[in-house]
């Protein structure tokens, strides 16, 4: 689980 709100491109 990654912070999508911090890095939306990482998704």
From Swiss-Prot:
The modification Lysine amide is found at residue 11. Expressed by the skin glands. Its main location: secreted. The keyword NADP does not apply. Signal peptide: none annotated. It is found in: Secreted. GO terms for cellular component: extracellular region. Keywords: Amidation, Secreted. Belongs to the frog skin active peptide (FSAP) family. Hyposin subfamily. This is Hyposin-H2. It comes from Pithecopus azureus (Orange-legged monkey tree frog).
């Amino acid at each position: 689980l990654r912070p999508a709100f911090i890095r939306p491109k990482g998704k």
